[in-house]
Amino acid sequence: MNAIDRVKKSRGINELAEQIEPLAQSMATLADEARQVMSQTQQASEAQAAEWLKAQRQTGAAWVELAKELREVAAEVSSAAQSARSASRGWHWKLWLTVMLASMMPTVVLLIASLLLLDLTPLTTEDGSIWLRLVAR
């Protein structure tokens, strides 16, 4: 027979009080234990929340520091790119002039050598055009 059945069958107030008292003590003990467990759970939850908040703040600070470093690197890269751009503008025409001279120089040397080594005799045709005849010396 369980405790509730015994309470229902009790006849007098004293008998009812005797039956209810162990139930009330058990409920009070359970309530105290529940309060204690809830308090421990709340403390653990608050501790975990504090750790989580601390970790979030550290992560946020790390992201802020990383963003700052990335801005500095981006500024340095931009400065280097600007320097390279301005340097390339200054050397652009010099490069083209050097390429032109280097490509024309062999042609000029061969032309001068051929003029010095060959005897050029002017010829006039019947129609009046003038031709240079190359004669080897």
Swiss-Prot record:
InterPro entries: Mobilisation_protein_B (IPR020369). Pfam families: Mobilization_B. Keywords: Conjugation, Mobility protein, Plasmid. It comes from the Bacteria. This protein is essential to promote the specific transfer of the plasmid in the presence of conjugative plasmids. Interacts with MobA and MobC to form the relaxosome. This is Mobilization protein B.
